[in-house]
Curated annotation (Swiss-Prot):
This is Octanoyltransferase LipM. Keywords: Acyltransferase, Transferase. Monomer. Its EC number is 2.3.1.181. It catalyses: octanoyl-[ACP] + L-lysyl-[protein] = N(6)-octanoyl-L-lysyl-[protein] + holo-[ACP] + H(+). It holds the Pfam family LplA-B_cat. Belongs to the octanoyltransferase LipM family. Catalyzes the transfer of endogenously produced octanoic acid from octanoyl-acyl-carrier-protein onto the lipoyl domain of GcvH, an intermediate carrier during protein lipoylation.
Amino acid sequence: METWRFIDHCSFSGAENMAIDEALLQEAINNHGAPVLRFYTWTRPTLSLGYFQKAQEEVDFSECEKLGVEVVRRPTGGRAVLHEFELTYSIVGSIQHPKLSGTVLESYLKISKGLLLGLKNLGIEGEIAEGKKTSDLSAICFEAPSWYELTVMGRKVIGSAQVRRGDYLLQHGAIVIKMDVDKLFRVLKFKSLEQKERIRASFHRKAGAIHDFSSREFSLAEIKEAFLAGFSEGFEVNFIRSELSLKERELSRQLLREKYNTREWLFRF
């Protein structure tokens, strides 16, 4: 059976996590390496913005400062995610690889099958969603599922985003364990109070977390084990535990210094 790398990381800052993900992508391009799966968490609450989001228009930086929330821009698209009580995954690999090949949506579907099996390993029956249009778009990622994202009883529990460079992709996503809705709605701006209250009122019908659908609370280790097994079964691969290479560490530090820790990157839109 084919072998992929698995990196099991602890907590990093938002900027560090984005720098590491991009470093893995860039080094995969440089070295044509095997696909990599990484699990990680966050040292403090972090609001990550999609690549094209407008930080000044959509983020309440005053509230972020009061609440100790870091703000970072992702290299991937999509909408804002508040990372706190979650396990985050990232996958890097070649789109020429048969297990990751195809269009963006086709590779999304292949990755989502592993996520679906991860939920099943926790005793949670999820579904792979078909995207739906909404007339009341907000900055919030979990406000509505996109194509091939994971839902449970119609509520989005895993949100993902992807970027491609040449023949390689990076996809990362939030596996939400529990959600602080109050904090999420405090750190984002809305067009009006009416819009904010309308979206918030419907939010619980559209978004959920693992602990909303289980009679017991899982440890982080149990959740990691469930999703690692899910990806292994979904992709039909073995994972070998790995660490960042010297070049990956050096590049992540460079990206942190020159990109993800800079105001130029955060406020580029």
